[in-house]
Each structure stands twice: as C-alpha cells, then as structure tokens.
Amino acid sequence: MNKKKNTILIGLYFLVGIMLFPDRIYAMHIAEGFLPVKWAGIWWIAMLPFLALGIKKVKSITQKEGPGIKMLLALAGAFVFVLSSLKLPSLTGSCSHPTGVGLGAILFGPWPMVVLGCIVLIFQAVLLAHGGLTTLGANVFSMAIVGPFVAYGAYRLLKKLNAPNWLSVFTGSALGNLLTYITTATQLAWAFPGKTGFIASLIKFMGVFATTQVPLAVTEGLVTVLIFNLLLEYSEGELKELSVISKGETV
C-alpha cells in the first residue's frame, strides 16, 4: 500500500469519528451485574471457544499479512468502536446503537471480529462504564459472535447468488445489526422469563428497541456500503488479496 492509500485510510478514521461520534457516549450493552450469576457464567463459557479461535486468526493475519491488510484490520476495529459507541434514543426511553461488525466480517470473516469486538467491549466496560465485565460474555456473544457470523453468512450467500456487491454488503451489515439485538433480547428473556414465560418476555424485550433498531440497521447498512466503496476505490488490491472481490467487480 502506497503513502496515498495510507493517508486515505487514516483519514477514514477521523471522517467516521467526526460524522458519527457524539458528545456523550452510551452503548446498549447488558449492564454490569444485571444478569444473574448463572447466566453470566453460561455466556462466558459459550464465548471463550470463539475467542480462542479468533485470537489464532488475528495472530495469523498480523504475522503473515502485509501492512495494507493490517491497516484494514485496524480500520475494522475502529469502525466497531465508533459505531457501537454511538447512542440513539429510543421512543421507549432506552437507547440503541449500531454495531459496526459487518464491515470487518465482510473483509476478514467472522473470527477476527470476535477478538476486535471483545477488545472494544472491554474498553467500553472498563473506561466508559458501558456494559460490564460480568456481562462481557453475553455482550461478546451477541455483538461479536452472532453479529459477525450472520453478516458474513448473508454476504457470502448473496455473493453466491450473484447479487450486486452493494446489496450483499448492505444486507450483511444490516442483518448483523438486527440479529445482535435479537440475541440480546433472547439473552434477557432467558434470564428474566417472568410470570408469563419466555415468549412473552422475549416480545417485551424486543419491543424495547424495535422502534429504532430497524431504521438503525438500514442506516448502518448504508454507512457500511459507503465505507466499502471508499475501500474499493483506494484499496482495491487489498480487497482482492483478501478475496473480498475479484477482478472487475464494483459496488
């Protein structure tokens, strides 16, 4: 990657930050101490194997790939941090936020995003008081495991069906966002089924964010397509090296 491409990619960090970073930072993660100990432990145990495999994948990228690919990996992590730190108010009085995991999943596959998402969530829990360490397993499972795997799966499926690149990127990113919140609602419903049972509790928790999450997922999909277009223009070689696109493809 030449100096011009490095400059453009570094500029993207600041561009995304200027456009999206709010004055105050909030995140819709399950808060510290909110889950019962049993469920907090279950999600930690469920998350750890994914994290271990993700670390191996990231280690392989950092050891074998060139500076251009490493820059894209860093960009994917920054994209997750910025978007997942963005608060949007909900009509229910709570808040929602994008996840940003779709871009990295499309570029590198879902495994590295488990690690990047975990790092972001730890940073937010320790330094920004968003989420928590006891609930880290649950938050990682929803945002850094389910989200990236859904985004990557949807993207690859549409590519196999010869869908346009823009549609594949948009759909993968949007579905990754939506399934993250569905997973979070499911986690809360399992932990707090209430007197009416799991299904009623799930509907209640999903309803908390439904009014904002669908348009938010659409917005995240559009932003991801925009960033992907910029990467295609200035980092086409790296995208081909990652087998994200083939020669002659456009978004």
Swiss-Prot record:
Superkingdom, natural source: Bacteria
Instruction: Enumerate the NCBIfam families for this protein.
Output: cbiM, PRK08319.1
Its pathway is: Cofactor biosynthesis; adenosylcobalamin biosynthesis
For this record, the Gene Ontology CC terms, alphabetical, are: ATP-binding cassette (ABC) transporter complex
InterPro entries assigned: CbiM, CbiM/NikMN
Q: Which organism is it from?
A: Acetohalobium arabaticum (strain ATCC 49924 / DSM 5501 / Z-7288)
Q: Where does this protein chiefly localize?
A: membrane
Task: Return the Gene3D superfamilies for the record.
Answer: 1.10.1760.20
Family named by the database record = Belongs to the CbiM family.
Quaternary structure note: Forms an energy-coupling factor (ECF) transporter complex composed of an ATP-binding protein (A component, CbiO), a transmembrane protein (T component, CbiQ) and 2 possible substrate-capture proteins (S components, CbiM and CbiN) of unknown stoichimetry.
Tell me, in a sentence or two, what this protein's role is.
Part of the energy-coupling factor (ECF) transporter complex CbiMNOQ involved in cobalt import.
Mention one GO molecular function. cobalt ion transmembrane transporter activity
Where exactly are the transmembrane stretches of this chain? 35-55, 66-86, 103-123, 131-151, 166-186, 208-228
Protein name per Swiss-Prot or TrEMBL:
Cobalt transport protein CbiM
Say if the entry is tagged with keyword Ion transport: yes
How does the UniProt record describe the way this protein sits in the membrane? Multi-pass membrane protein
Localization (cell): Cell membrane
Instruction: Output the GO biological process annotations, alphabetical, semicolon-separated.
Output: cobalamin biosynthetic process
